């Protein structure tokens, strides 16, 4: 199933495309946003090309761009990703620094997870965040996820490893 266009009070959630390359760099190239992200800091707009070209090609990954209705600007992205080996759907998200602490990620992810639950056989939703990333922890708590385990993860280029926590929620047994 293709990623649809969804709407919340303040956001339009839509598929990402290569046309978003310049806007995506606003957060992927910002060290404040990138601090705990799995991908390395993008040093140029072109660093995001490979990711954007791949986002809509994997049926198990549902990525959305977050468009702020008030300005029409693409301000972040997030999604839900199926892991068939574990029958778990994981969530991930990021947003431009200027939009932190406004409840926008929670608003977007509530809509995205509700859409996934309505359209797929979602049994468990999980998310992992670095210890110290209190903003991400708050989003997961507001989504109803609770502590599952201590873990760790590394950036894709192995430049940094983080102590982390995984939160989860059983949707149905």
Specify the residue positions occupied by each region the protein language model found.
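A short helix-loop-beta-strand connector motif used in the catalytic cores of GNAT acetyltransferases and
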Residues: 53-65
